[in-house]
Amino acid sequence: MTKNEKAEIIEKASKLLLKNNKEEALEIINNNYNFEYKKIEKRSYNDKQKLKIFIRDGFIDRYSGNKLLNPGILKVFSTYFPKEFPYHRNWKMDETHMAYWELLPTIDHINPIATGGKDEDDNIITTSQLNNSIKSNWTLEQLRWKIYDAGDR
C-alpha cells in the first residue's frame, strides 16, 4: 500500500469521524490500515559483546563511513577535563560533549526489531550514538541510507 493510499484511508475515516460516525471510521481503519502488535524479543549486550562488533566493523560508523573511537579514550578526557569534556550517564545533550554523540560507537539493528528485524549478528552493525538516535526504528530505505564497508580490522 502506498503512502497516498494510506493517507486516503485516514482521510476517509476522518470524514466519518467529523460526522460522528465512529463505528464506520473504526471499521475502515481496522479493515484497511490496522495496527499490528509485534512481540519483541530483544537481548541485551554487554561491553565485551559490543566491542567484538566494533572490532568486526573496524570502528567505522556503518551508516556514514566515519571513524569512531574506542569508548575508553573519550572517558579519559571526561575524567581529566570534566568541565570542558562533560559526560552525562543519561545522555543529556546539554550536559554531554558532542564527541560522545558523534564519535562513540554503539550497536544498532539494521532492520529494526520493532518492525520485525531479527536480533542476530548479521542484523547488527556499529554506528555512532547520533546516527543510532536519528535512525531509531526507521528502515534504511525510509531514510535513503546505505551501509558502508567495515574498516580495517
Predicted feature locations:
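A generic secondary-structure signal for well-formed alpha-helical elements
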Residues: 68, 131-135, 151
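Short cysteine-rich loop/turn motifs with clustered Cys
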Residues: 47-104, 128
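A boundary/linker detector
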Residues: 1-52, 58, 65-71
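Intrinsically disordered, low-complexity, charge-dense segments enriched in Lys/Arg
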Residues: 141-149, 153
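Single-residue recognition of alpha-helix boundary sites
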Residues: 76, 119-120, 143
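Short Cys/His-rich "knuckle" micro-motifs
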Residues: 71-74, 135-140
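Short beta-strand-alpha-helix junction that forms the catalytic/metal-binding core
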Residues: 58-61, 101-133
